[in-house]
Regions:
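Helix-loop-helix hairpin linking two adjacent transmembrane segments in secondary transporters
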Residues: 135-178
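Conserved MFS/SLC helix-loop-helix module at the cytosolic interface between two early adjacent transmembrane helices
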Residues: 58-94
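Juxtamembrane intracellular "pre-TM" segments in multi-pass secondary transporters
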Residues: 2-3, 182-213
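Cytoplasmic helix-loop-helix junction between adjacent transmembrane helices
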Residues: 102-139
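Short amphipathic helix-loop junctions that connect adjacent transmembrane helices
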Residues: 28-42, 228-244
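C-terminal membrane-cytosol helix-exit motif in multi-pass small-molecule transporters
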Residues: 168-187, 376-384
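Helix-to-loop junctions at the C-terminal end of transmembrane segments
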Residues: 60-71, 259-272
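Cytoplasmic membrane-interface "Motif A"-like loop-to-helix N-cap segments
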Residues: 69-79, 268-281
Length: 441
């Protein structure tokens, strides 16, 4: 990576991290902290938790397309301003309705797809996977940090303190965008990172992508629904006090990561991705199902550890699988649909989890999660193990398309080629285990 690429990537990753940290800090505490609100019901709790997912799902692709026309920075700045406004509304709210409105406004600052497109503007093709890995790492770190900071901030400043801190993080994001991210006059259209509305209908019919989209919906449904019940279980049944809560979450999430790592490495090494995938879904489903029975402290913590270990594996596996399975030149659009399903899953998990809690109690929450995950497991049975495919974006220049196709088609390991009139780019899908990269230079 060049100095410019590294600076841009770290800056974009930090904006991602600030935003995700603000959104997730409420998860471990909101179920307990809102219990005395005048309009509190478990259903309203679920709506508050998932509200950001609905608005983000609706707006993320349109805002990404808008950034193609007016530039990345104006859209990102506007999204962060709306995010800060939502944080203000939630911070001063003393009702569940006010919290719901604030969380919905936070989600309306849907800048994830625009930030990903900005990565394309600043990084060369050969460095893009490194940039995406850095951003993924920042999101994962933000999630773990949020689970620790949420209880700490709430213990000192109350629930409103989380939203005030979130507003500060939004301001920090604005400063990074304005002062740290390098200036550029170019906005590259790259089908590997940006959506094209004309391709959506075809991608929705792809059987493999359908299963992966159902998967990410179910995964984030489960995550959001579980956090309706987990805080009260830890407080009332396990007996975790406020000062110990951050360390318990660190143990669950950190321990889950280290449990997941060997399984992921082995599945890649021995080409057992599908088997590991199905096992992880079933582990999540069984963990949720077992939580509906009599719970002791040790059993509860063990089941939650297994749940988060499987979650970590699936959260890391799904985007990688999607990038290998999507048709050449359609990764940006496929990721847009995938992210929309992810956010809709978060909204549905909050809504249905809250309704289940209100009607059937904690067992209803974990039962609904187990059912959703079992449905996903059945869908996932039809998946084919991913091939080691990678899409390269090559500059065509002034060479004739037919001549380029003739040259590139003779390269061993080339699986598919997409040339789009007027773009001067070729999207070439290759088998990483066979292709000679030097022959594509």
């Amino acid at each position: 990576m060049t100095t410019l690429e590294r600076r841009a990537t770290i800056s974009i990753a930090s904006v991602f991290g600030f935003r995700m940290l603000g959104l997730f800090m409420v998860l471990p505490v909101i179920a307990i902290a809102t219990g005395d609100y005048p309009d509190f019901t478990p259903l309203m709790l679920g709506v508050v938790l998932g509200a950001y997912g609905l608005t983000q799902a609706i707006l993320q692709i349109p805002l990404g397309l808008l950034s193609d026309n007016i530039g990345r920075k104006p859209v990102i700045m506007g999204g962060l301003v709306v995010f800060i406004l939502g944080s203000f509304v939630a911070a001063i709210a003393d009702t569940m309705f006010g919290l719901m409105l604030g969380r919905a406004l936070q989600g309306m600052g849907a800048i994830a797809s625009t930030l990903m497109a900005m990565v394309t503007d600043y990084t060369a093709e050969q460095n893009r996977s490194k940039a995406m890995a850095m951003i993924g790492g920042s999101i994962g770190f933000s999630f773990i940090l949020a689970m620790m900071l949420g209880p700490l901030v709430t213990g000192v400043f109350g629930l409103s303190g989380i939203f005030w801190l979130t507003a500060v993080l939004g301001f920090l994001g604005i400063l990074v965008v304005q002062l740290v991210i390098p200036k550029t006059s170019k906005t590259n259209f790259n089908r590997e990172s940006m959506a094209d509305l004309q391709d959506i209908s075809a991608l929705l019919k792809d059987p493999t992508l359908q299963r992966l989209n159902v998967g990410v919906f179910a995964l984030h449904f489960a995550l959001m629904a579980v956090f309706i019940g987990v805080p009260s279980i830890l407080a009332n049944e396990v007996g975790v006090t406020g000062s110990d809560l951050p360390w318990v979450y660190l143990g669950l999430l950190g321990g889950g990561f280290f449990l997941m790592l060997p399984m992921m490495i082995m599945s890649e090494k021995f080409a057992m991705q599908k088997s590991a995938f199905l096992v992880a879904v079933m582990v999540m489903a069984l963990s949720a199902f077992c939580l509906t029975f009599g719970r002791t402290s040790l059993i509860t913590l063990t089941l939650l550890l297994l749940f988060f270990a499987a979650f970590n594996l699936l959260e890391a596996s799904l985007p990688s699988w999607l990038s290998k399975a999507c048709p050449v030149g359609n990764r940006g659009t496929a990721m847009g649909v995938y992210s929309t399903c992810q956010f809709l899953g978060a909204f549905a998990g909050g809504l249905i989890g809250g309704w289940s809690m209100q009607k059937y109690g904690l067992n209803g929450v974990f039962g609904s999660v187990a059912c959703m995950l079992l449905v996903w497991w059945v869908f996932a049975l039809g998946l084919q193990s991913p091939r080691p495919l990678k899409t390269l974006v090559l500059a065509v220049g002034d060479i004739e398309h037919q001549e380029f196709l003739k040259i590139i088609s003779n390269v061993v390991g080339v699986e598919d080629i997409l040339l789009v009139e007027g773009e001067h780019l070729a999207y070439v899908q290759v088998d990483r285990l066979v292709v000679d990269m030097n022959s594509l230079q």
